[in-house]
Amino acid sequence: TSTNHTFKNVNMTLLNSTLNYGEVKSEKETRKITNSNYHIIMESTDRNIRRDAYEKLTSKIAEFKNIFAENLVSNMKNTSSMAEIRKFPSTLDSLLFSSNIPNSVVDSLYKVINKNLNVYQKYLKLIKNSLGLKELAYYDLNAQILTDEMSFSIEDAQYLIGEATKIYGEEYHDIIEKAFNEKWVDYCSYKGKASGAYCTSCYGAHPVVLTNFFGKFGDVSAVAHELGHAVNFYLSQQANNKHDYNNDIFVAEVASLTNEIILSNYVIEHSRNKNLKLIALYNLINLIQNNLFDACLEGELENKAYTLIDNGETIDAEYLSSTIYDLSLIHI
């Protein structure tokens, strides 16, 4: 909806081009913190750099927490109102309607995740021990625990992705090559560009991928991820009309995450570099962390907030902050 787009645009404008997060300094360089390169900085082996970047970014965002909260809550209230107008029992039911999924599936997912948090916590303990820390802080979660001085060029990324996706067959591989040759991917990072990676598609035109490429294996994996969406959109356009070509959000990540898994498995199977094999394995673990445990943590926050809004209660920045903090304590 237009309201949803406005919510996203306000957030992206603030995070990516308006807020100034300052700089972090090391013995080698001074680096400006942006919403795009923050995740790279947080992989630093220097804990002081990680802590400095974390405190500067989060404190700056905290200055505008009421604006972010009001923007989020306004969007959620609109979604809740539309669910009520359309006679859904809850907002969650309305959001799951197009996927034909009962909300009991979501409840079951959260229960299973919470029941198996010991697996995730065992991984966090491994990170803590690998870093030689007595206590693990939030800014330690993405610290590089492997010796990762490897750098990948765009051409390296294209080669690895091309080789890994040959497993799908000639048609799929040809579309991947077409995407590279016709420059479907925007790799560069610059001020104002959205952080992370995205794929967008308009019926009748080829998909476009936006990413922020810094030369790490994770960046190669991100390109593979978004190209999974791109090929999916491309083939779906060929097989469907413009009213039916879009896929359902519940299964949208299948095409993309499968590509990341295939890429990492390809490297593990074919590389002769032991460290690169470990980096690829580490990437697989991060996929589980980000797309299962972290996603469910954020989903629980959203679900709790929608329940209150559906019942006519008021939520604000303090509620959102305290709730995500309490949920994080359970997970971590």
Segments from the language model and where they lie:
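Post-HExxH zinc-binding segment in Zn-dependent metallohydrolases
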Residues: 247-274, 290
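Post-HEXXH active-site segment of zinc metalloproteases
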Residues: 233-254
